[in-house]
């Protein structure tokens, strides 16, 4: 969340303007855009339930912007190591162990006074393990839930604004690849392993025009096309 600027929630059929499949609503996570030259590094350690189980989180943020503000880049990274937590001492975790790394970047380039290109890339690598006997393979434990995710996401967008601010054209594309390996089983079942690989891409364009007066009131016309 250290790169999140705001979260926009839109309910109802009007959300289809943001995507052809968004018929019930959308949740848009808007990431921060680089505005100044800055860098920060932080680390926190939390004891879970006052025990020796620790949650360690290290975060890095940095941004660089040219003097004329025509180009900028922001990068972030997070490393999290959380121990499994057994609240009642029965040998089974209530909170799984977590080992995750998250990195990403957002950059922009102003190609003209009224146009710009924005690009983003995010990578998430996460391992979770819950149950008992966390130090041995999951199929040797009595109960085990183990999931490993590797997610890569990238997007690029071109925006053009007319000098009179009435016309706007956006051309966009994004792609995401997910690799997931899991184990959900009990009784030392060796056949409870699973795996999933998925590739998703979206590309499209959107045109907006603002009417100062349409019949008797201001209005906005929106048209677009999307492929996935």
Where are these regions (language model features)?
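N-terminal periplasmic accessory domains that precede
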Residues: 1, 9, 21-44, 56-61
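Hydrophobic, lipid-facing positions within transmembrane beta-strands of outer-membrane proteins
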Residues: 25, 39, 56-60, 71, ...
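Short loop/turn motifs that connect adjacent beta-strands in outer-membrane beta-barrel proteins
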Residues: 34-38, 66-71, 113-116, 161-168, ...
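Membrane-embedded beta-strand positions of outer-membrane beta-barrel proteins
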Residues: 39-43, 73-77, 105-107, 119-121, ...
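Flexible loop and strand-edge segments within Gram-negative outer membrane beta-barrel domains
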Residues: 82-102, 108-110, 114-169, 176-198
């Amino acid at each position: 969340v250290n790169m999140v600027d705001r979260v926009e929630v839109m309910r109802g059929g009007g959300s289809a303007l943001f995507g052809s499949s968004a018929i019930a609503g959308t949740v848009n996570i808007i990431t921060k855009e680089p505005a100044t030259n800055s860098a920060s590094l932080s680390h926190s350690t939390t004891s879970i339930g006052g025990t020796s189980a620790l949650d360690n989180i290290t975060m890095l943020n940095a941004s660089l912007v040219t003097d004329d503000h025509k180009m900028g880049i922001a990068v972030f990274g997070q490393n999290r190591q959380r121990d499994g937590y057994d609240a009642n001492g029965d040998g089974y975790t209530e909170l799984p162990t977590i080992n995750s790394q998250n990195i990403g970047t957002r950059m922009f380039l102003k190609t003209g006074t009224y146009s710009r290109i924005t690009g983003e890339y995010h990578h998430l690598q996460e391992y979770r393990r819950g149950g008992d006997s966390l130090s041995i393979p999951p199929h040797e434990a009595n109960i085990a839930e183990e999931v490993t995710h590797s997610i890569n996401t990238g997007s690029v967008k071109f925006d053009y604004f007319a000098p009179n601010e009435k016309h706007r054209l956006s051309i966009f594309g994004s792609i995401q690849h997910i690799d997931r390996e899991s184990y959900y089983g009990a009784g030392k079942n060796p056949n409870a392993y699973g795996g999933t690989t998925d590739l998703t891409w979206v590309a499209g364009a959107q045109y907006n025009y603002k009417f100062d007066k349409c019949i008797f009131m201001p209005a906005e016309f929106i048209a677009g096309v999307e492929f996935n």
